Structure formats: structure tokens, C-alpha cells
Amino acid sequence: MSRETKSNTSKTAHDTLAKKSRDEGVISGGHLVAKALKTEGVDTIFTLCGGHIIDIYDGCIDEGIRIVDVRHEQTAAHAADGYARQTGKLGCVVTTAGPGCTNAVTGVATAFRSESPILHIGGQSSLTQHKQGSLQDLSLIHI
């Protein structure tokens, strides 16, 4: 890569967002989530990468929160539980919408029964597409 190309490369996810936006003061909801996680002392999230939650990853990178990407959401939930039990810190599992959230239920239930401090953040389809059969649209609050 040439020096010229390197100098034009974004250094952070915030830089990338700023380039996409006409208003550099705009911040995504995912970045706000990451800032809130950092404020609460979260230093690691367990996840399976998904499109609905990509802005959270960008925010976590900017905030210095470690992202542990696993192969299944149930693994992410169990890992967050194990992390909480071993460290005494809040374990955080981040899943994409629909099946991503439902796949984590067993791990979240295990943590609940064991009184492990974990937080499950689930993605959601766009509100403009809510209840219109969009990809992975599922009401998750009741689950």
C-alpha cells in the first residue's frame, strides 16, 4: 500500500461513519450502545457477527471493547456466562435479530438460573420494516 493510500485510510469506525455522513457530528445507535457498555465497565462482548448489529462492533472497536466472535449464538451466551462467573464482571452477549436472539436463549436461561450477571443485546430489523416480514423480524421482548 502506498503512503498516499495509507493516509486516506480511516483509522477508526467513527472516521468511517463520518465519511459516510454529511454531518460529522452524527453518531450511530451502535456507537451509543458501545459507549454505554464502556461506561458500565464492559470490556469484552461475545457475539456471532451479524448485519443488524454491525454498528455496535464499530463502536466497540472505537471504545476499546474486545470482540470475541464465535460460531454459534448459544456459545456466545455460555461464554458470557462463564466470563461473568470467572471475572465477576458483567458478561455481555450481542446477537443479531430473530434466530440470533432465539439461539442464545439456553445460555441466557442458564446464566439467569445461576444468577450470573450477563446482558443480552439483540439486534432488530429496521422499524420501517417492522411487522412486514423483513429478514429475521421477530418480536423478542417476550422471549
Model-derived features: positions:
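N-terminal alpha/beta PP-like core and its mobile active-site loop of ThDP/TPP-dependent enzymes
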Residues: 2-141
